[in-house]
Structures are given as C-alpha cells and as structure tokens.
C-alpha cells in the first residue's frame, strides 16, 4: 500500500513538472527561429536621387500593370485612396505630402497581408536588374513611400528612439556590427505598444531616417515610425536572456546599392548607388523578412467585431 502511495506521489510530481515545463516552453514560443542579422544586400533599396520627376512619369503606366497582377495591392491601394479623399480631398491648401505619397503611407499601414507581400518582394527585389524589372510588382508603392519619408523628414529633420517587438524570430548579432532591415520597417514611439507584436525579439532603435506617420495611418494610436530599407545601423548592445532577445541599434547613415533602377537600359548592369557610410560589403545570405505588425483590420476582409476604417 505504501508502495502504491509512493507511486502516486511520483506520478503527480512528474505531471506537475511536465505542466510547468510545457508552460515555460509556450512562453518561449516553440515556433521561433533564429536568424543572424546582416546588411540585407539583396534588398531593393533605391532612393531615387535626382530622378524623381522622370520616375513619376514612368510609373503612371507601371501602376496599372501592377494592379492587374496583385489583387491584395490593388484593393488596399483603392481603400487607401478612398480614405485620402475622405480626410483631405476637399482641402483648399496643399498638404504636406502629395496625394500619392499620402496614399502610399495609408496603404502600408492598412493591411498586414499586403505589407507582408511587399516586404518579401522588397527584401529580394535587389538580386538583379531582371528580377526588379519583371518580378518586383511594387515599384509604385516603393517609390512613393520613399518619397513620402524624405518629404516628412525634410520638414522636421531629427532622430527618434523607437521600439519594435517581433514574434517568431530571434535575431542574432554582435556589438559593433553594421546591419540594415532591408525593408520598410514599422516601429513605435511607445515601448508598451510593441508587446502585442511579439516578444521573441525586442528592438530598441535610434533612427535618423525613419519618420512618424501617425497622421497618415489607419491606426494612429500605434504612434508608428516607419524606417526605410536603406538606413544603416550599428549594433550598440545585444542580449539573449532565456530566449528573449534584446537588440539596441543606433543609426550610422544610409546606404543604397541601386538608384533610379527603373530608368536604366534593359540588360544594363547594376552600379553601386548612393552611399554615405563606409562599409565593407560582402555577399551573404539574405535576412528573412521581418514580420509585419499585426493589424486589427485587414484590407481584404475583417473578423466579426473588428473596427473597419470608415472609408471602406
């Protein structure tokens, strides 16, 4: 009898230990992967320096083609255009941004589905000239987002301390390393706002080329700051405490390997673009796409009870 009682005690202890271990594993997110940060050299990082007017003229036809091949992009852009019309369509004075720039920011903030497709394409769109011309179907969005960030920064040039939580990826790096996100990256001025977007990695970032887009977002409460793909950061600090990664980055300039790519002759070789920091560039594996911040509302549908922007 005593032996039976002892077995029950041991079994109960085993079950409790298993339950505790299971809970701890859930908190650590078993689905997370480990990724080493790099300079994202496959990224399409065009800054369109000295070719803005020619790009606008060329993109008038490109946008029609892109809409026909990318339904998520087309639907989200139309919804963003409707929201622009509602907010600013009847203003008598010029806006801080031109219409297309404001719509691009609204579209980026509206749908995590389109954002994910866009970021995936942007991180690989710089592999070759042919890939960009024939396979990168976000040329218009990339151009107007880039121009919007430059315009907003010109009106208030300063640096911001921002935060970004990530679910599903534990990024690895080392102090002193130069890195880029290689995509348009959403961050927040409020640390508490990052918790809902994941805790496997926390980025604490000093950005000098990212700008607040609260005025041009479907979700102004997030206090979003959008960082461009060409900004270069130095890793100031890195820690990995029981599976929770914290990375501190400081802006050290900007670097693009491509410029005005759409205007180059077909079959032309890519030349090095605009560079403002001295970096030793070496080809390497491309960093997987940083997940888009989850949006409560999705541009291609919604869940019952979720708020939907009034323009839809």
Swiss-Prot record:
One Pfam family in the UniProt entry: ART
Any Gene Ontology biological process: response to antibiotic
Major location (coarse): secreted
SUPFAM superfamilies, sorted: ADP-ribosylation
Domain TR mART core: 71-256
Family (UniProt): Belongs to the Arg-specific ADP-ribosyltransferase family.
Protein name per the record: NAD(P)(+)--arginine ADP-ribosyltransferase 1
Organism: Gallus gallus
